[in-house]
């Protein structure tokens, strides 16, 4: 009992300082250039669960709760588009038990989004990017219902990359372009960067200003390969469930200090 009390003393002592620094950062960020689109590779859920000697689903559950927090942070800063990498096409190679647990979690969370009054109050549109035909029918239907229920909203966009791969997205786009060329709907000489973008999973999505990867790994992992050519990349050495608002604000602040050249 005494050990538990003592172990919390540093947190109690430093919390006012921490809160003051967070408030300071928030005001600094609000006074600067706010990114329009933030994309996040939500990595480290399983390793976080393993550290706590818990099963993988436990990490994914807490990761989904962290995503809810990040949505609120984005709304507070008026970041209009958030894209998250939830499940890749390669992730289907994981154990049957983990994939099934994840699919059940996705179905549950999509249904919660439809009922969440904050989604409707703030006008958050849900878009699911990926090969939906690879998803179990119950998950696909839940995802499509979340899209239908929020289709009329335009204040904010939550893009969920599910059964997604950047190379798959480009391959699917090329396949559709070839089909339209053969059918005479588009001329080969009209194919340029913007034309290709119109064939991506969500063509109206602005390119990400920032890509954040949690979990300590320094790689892109086949995420939004066409869209992130000029994005600012940030790699954070913290598991996704432990990602803090102060980490998020520091990244936005660093983004504001960078001079983006877009290849010029």
Curated annotation (Swiss-Prot):
The EC code for this enzyme is 2.5.1.89
Keywords associated with the record: Magnesium, Metal-binding, Transferase
Q: Which InterPro entries match?
A: UPP_synth-like (IPR001441), UPP_synth-like_CS (IPR018520), UPP_synth-like_sf (IPR036424)
**CDD domains in alphabetical order:** Cis_IPPS
Q: What GO MF terms are annotated?
A: magnesium ion binding; prenyltransferase activity
Which residues are listed for Mg(2+) binding in this entry?
Answer: 43, 232
* Recorded family membership: Belongs to the UPP synthase family.
PROSITE patterns associated with the record: UPP_SYNTHASE
A single BP term in Gene Ontology: polyprenol biosynthetic process
What does the note under cofactor report?
Answer: Binds 2 magnesium ions per subunit.
Transferase: present as a keyword of the record?
Answer: yes
Q: Does the keyword Transferase apply?
A: yes
User: Which enzyme class?
Assistant: transferase
Cite the binding residues for substrate: 44-48, 60, 88-90, 92, 94, 213, 219-221
Name of the gene this protein is made from: uppS
| Catalysis performed (reactions) | geranylgeranyl diphosphate + 7 isopentenyl diphosphate = tri-trans,hepta-cis-undecaprenyl diphosphate + 7 diphosphate
The residues responsible for catalysis, as annotated, are: 43, 91
Q: Extract the PANTHER family matched here.
A: DEHYDRODOLICHYL DIPHOSPHATE SYNTHASE COMPLEX SUBUNIT DHDDS, DEHYDRODOLICHYL DIPHOSPHATE SYNTHASE FAMILY MEMBER
Q: What is this protein called?
A: Tritrans,polycis-undecaprenyl-diphosphate synthase (geranylgeranyl-diphosphate specific)
Job description of the protein:
Catalyzes the sequential condensation of isopentenyl diphosphate (IPP) with geranylgeranyl diphosphate (GGPP) to yield (2Z,6Z,10Z,14Z,18Z,22Z,26Z,30E,34E,38E)-undecaprenyl diphosphate (tritrans,heptacis-UPP). It is probably the precursor of glycosyl carrier lipids.
Its required cofactor(s), as named, are:
Mg(2+)
Q: How does it assemble?
A: Homodimer.
């Amino acid at each position: 009992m005494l050990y538990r009390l003592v172990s919390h003393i540093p947190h109690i002592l430093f919390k006012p300082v921490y809160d003051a620094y967070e408030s300071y950062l928030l005001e600094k960020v609000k006074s600067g250039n706010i990114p329009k689109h933030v994309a996040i590779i939500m990595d480290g859920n399983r390793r976080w669960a393993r550290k706590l000697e818990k099963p993988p689903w436990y990490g994914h559950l807490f990761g989904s709760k962290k995503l809810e927090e990040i949505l609120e942070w984005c709304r507070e800063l008026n970041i209009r588009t958030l894209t998250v990498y939830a499940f890749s096409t390669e992730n289907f190679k994981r154990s049957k038990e983990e994939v099934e647990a994840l699919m059940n979690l996705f179905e549950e969370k999509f249904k919660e989004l439809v009922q969440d009054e904050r989604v409707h109050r703030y006008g958050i549109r849900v878009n699911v990017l990926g090969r939906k035909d690879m998803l179990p029918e119950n998950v696909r239907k839940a995802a499509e219902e979340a899209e239908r229920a929020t289709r009329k909203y335009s204040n904010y966009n939550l893009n969920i990359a599910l059964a997604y791969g950047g190379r798959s997205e480009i391959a699917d786009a090329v396949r559709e372009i070839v089909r339209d060329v053969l059918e005479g709907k588009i001329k080969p000489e009209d194919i340029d960067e913007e034309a290709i973008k119109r064939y991506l999973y969500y063509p109206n999505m602005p390119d990400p200003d920032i890509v954040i990867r949690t979990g300590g790994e320094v790689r892109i992992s086949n995420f939004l390969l066409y869209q992130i050519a000029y994005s600012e990349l940030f790699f954070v050495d913290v598991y996704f469930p432990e990602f803090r608002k102060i980490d998020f604000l520091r990244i936005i602040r660093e983004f504001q200090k960078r001079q983006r050249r877009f290849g010029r």
